[in-house]
Amino acid sequence: MIFRQLFDHVSSSYSYLIASRTGGEALIIDPVLDKVERYLKLLEELDLKLVKAIDTHVNADHITGLGALRDRTRCTTVMGRESQTDVVSIRVSDGDTIEIEGVCLRALHTPGHTDDSYCYRMNGRVFTGDTLLIRGTGRTDFQNGDSQAAYDSLFNKLLTLPDETLVYPGHDYKGDTVSTIGEERRHNPRLQVSSAEDYADLMDKLNLSNPKMMDVAVPANLKIGLSQDAVEARGWSLTCAQARDSLGQPDIVLIDLRDKAERAAHGEIPGSVHAPYPELEENVKPGGLLNEIATATGKRLVFYCAFGERSAMAVQAAQEAGLEKSCHIKGGIDAWKKIGGDLEGGEAKNS
């Protein structure tokens, strides 16, 4: 296991780089924009391929590195379904899993600090974002914060984990790096309350000033998505209606870029070929699956994903590889469902 806790002194933020082995796939949690070059160097030194970048919530004290890492590595971006960020590749709900080679995280929706806050559990560790800090908890007085929701997240989710679970927070201001659930239950001053009302009263009396970066960071972090308009302007997009009208035509092939778990949960467009996004670079090269399909049949590759971000990047990669007939479905499965497009498999009929 490769595990690196990386600190940004300006915002007192922790980021976490995780992989199962040297030379394998990696993910990063809560990357900071100003540290992207550091992350890229570390990835190169460890011979890692970044495949997923996760934000635990929309941060107010630093600008996220999600967009820059996506642009530099073509990684998949991940946030909670409640996030108001314009475009991310995968939106998780409580209980969902995020997987890469040899690593599995389970998403825990923990609203309170913000309404889109998530923690991620991995074996004996939990990455708590700003929900639970070492001897502290996240403030609840902005970004749809709610002290009673925070109490529920803390006492009915995080504090139900085994005492020995290691706690890795999104921030620290005193030089601490790790704690445990048991330590925080016993020694965290904000957890020494007897009711949600007591916790709300404690939090309401903090009278904290807003983070210095808040007016810059929050708007920036809501706009990290890859613009699909630029892809559309080059004639590389189909609307969902156009894609639906083209179903069954002999000159196209639909390419589903999503993970197996996404397909199982949300279904797939009938007749799709599954070519997972992390394998894209190999698949569009000469000899790769998608290159072979396109060159052997002359068919147009029509990419789709969950929200259109991965497919927009995929069509750019395919065009760069000389697959000039390729395009993508703007808005992905999310938009496809909204127009009543056909889906098969998984839980599609119930979603």
Region roles according to the model:
Residues 5, 17, 97-122, 160:
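Core dinuclear metal-dependent hydrolase active-site scaffold
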